[in-house]
UniProtKB/Swiss-Prot annotation:
Superkingdom to which the source organism belongs: Eukaryota
Record's protein name: LOB domain-containing protein 23
Membership in a protein family: Belongs to the LOB domain-containing protein family.
PROSITE patterns (UniProt xref): LOB
Length: 121
């Protein structure tokens, strides 16, 4: 048993075994992280997911699960898809603004070059 139980084992009110699948990813000083993931996915499902993954990808998977769970708690209808949609909309607006600015630059350069040509004649 670990001297300090991980956030998952504290939340689940159980002993934290030496081979606890949660302890590397849910430290005792961040209980909200596990609570959010547990609320959305359930401890059993998260445990199964982590055990099916190679050790080197588990940390990234936990970060993704935490982000997605927090998004789902904050926005129960859309979750992280709402954020993705918002970001895509911002990208599209920025691309449109960039295209407009590039067109204005092209017009200004054309006028400038025509001014220089007429100055030489």
């Amino acid at each position: 048993m670990n001297p300090k139980r991980c956030a998952a084992c504290k939340y689940l009110r159980r002993r934290c075994p030496k081979d606890c699948v949660f302890s590397p990813y849910f430290p005792p000083n961040d209980p909200q992280k596990f609570a959010c993931v547990h609320r959305i996915y359930g401890a059993g499902n998260v445990s199964k997911m982590l055990q099916q993954l190679p050790d080197q990808t588990r940390a990234e998977a936990v970060e993704s699960l935490c982000f997605e769970a927090k998004c789902r708690v904050d926005d129960p209808v859309y979750g992280c898809v709402g954020i993705i949609h918002l970001l895509k909309t911002q990208i599209q607006k920025t691309q449109n603004e960039l295209a407009k600015t590039q067109a204005e630059i092209a017009v200004a350069q054309t006028k400038l070059s025509q001014t220089h040509i007429s100055d030489f004649m």
